[in-house]
Amino acid sequence: MSKVCVLTGKRPKYGNTVSHANNHRRTRFEPNLHTKRIWIDEEKRWAKVKLSAKAMKIIAKTGTAELAKLLK
């Protein structure tokens, strides 16, 4: 299962978790992804996509036109 946002391209990042004692251990930071059904007006159909929280805000502001271009 891919952990990549369709609209923004966000993907997991790698870094360190640092404790109070300054011990470092490697960790994977996952993007805040959700599987959503979005209605595409131009094509009159539902599209099931993985979106980050930021992508959902972008769609709320601009509409689904950008997303429709990416899904073609």
UniProtKB/Swiss-Prot annotation:
GO terms for molecular function: structural constituent of ribosome. Keywords: Ribonucleoprotein, Ribosomal protein. The keyword RNA-binding does not apply. One of its GO terms (cellular component) is ribosome. The keyword Nucleotide-binding does not apply. InterPro entries: Bacterial_rp_bL28, Ribosomal_bL28, Ribosomal_bL28/bL31-like_sf, Ribosomal_bL28_bact-type, Ribosomal_bL28_sf. GO terms for biological process: translation. HAMAP family: Ribosomal_bL28 (MF_00373). PANTHER family: 50S RIBOSOMAL PROTEIN L28, LARGE RIBOSOMAL SUBUNIT PROTEIN BL28A. Belongs to the bacterial ribosomal protein bL28 family. NCBIfam families: L28. This is Large ribosomal subunit protein bL28. The gene is rpmB.
